[in-house]
Amino acid sequence: MTENEKVTRNVQGRVVSNKADKTITVLVERRVRHPLYGKYIRRSSKMQAHDEGNECQVGDVVTIEQCRPISKSKAWRLVKVLERAAQ
């Protein structure tokens, strides 16, 4: 039999808030094609992620991955900071 490996979903986004303790809000943008007209449209989602070390600042570009639910609104955790915001 094959081993049961979890496939985690990773996304990249920009931190828009870090006001809560150990929590960041990440804005994830994606491009989708309009079904009738074919034009590409930007769609965005705000996700709350767990930041154990409070290391992120507003404007950072980060990678987050899906995990077990940590609270009512958090089911993502910070993997790494890709790019720091200009201070």
Swiss-Prot record:
GO terms for biological process: translation. Coiled coil: none annotated. GO terms for cellular component: cytosolic small ribosomal subunit. SUPFAM superfamilies: Nucleic acid-binding proteins (SSF50249). It holds the Pfam family Ribosomal_S17. Keywords: Ribonucleoprotein, Ribosomal protein, RNA-binding, rRNA-binding. InterPro entries: NA-bd_OB-fold, Ribosomal_uS17, Ribosomal_uS17_bact/chlr, Ribosomal_uS17_CS. Gene3D superfamilies: Nucleic acid-binding proteins. The keyword Coiled coil does not apply. One of its GO terms (molecular function) is structural constituent of ribosome. Part of the 30S ribosomal subunit. One of the primary rRNA binding proteins, it binds specifically to the 5'-end of 16S ribosomal RNA. PANTHER family: 40S RIBOSOMAL PROTEIN S11 FAMILY MEMBER, SMALL RIBOSOMAL SUBUNIT PROTEIN US17M. Belongs to the universal ribosomal protein uS17 family. This is Small ribosomal subunit protein uS17. The lineage of its organism: Bacteria, Pseudomonadati, Pseudomonadota, Gammaproteobacteria, Chromatiales.
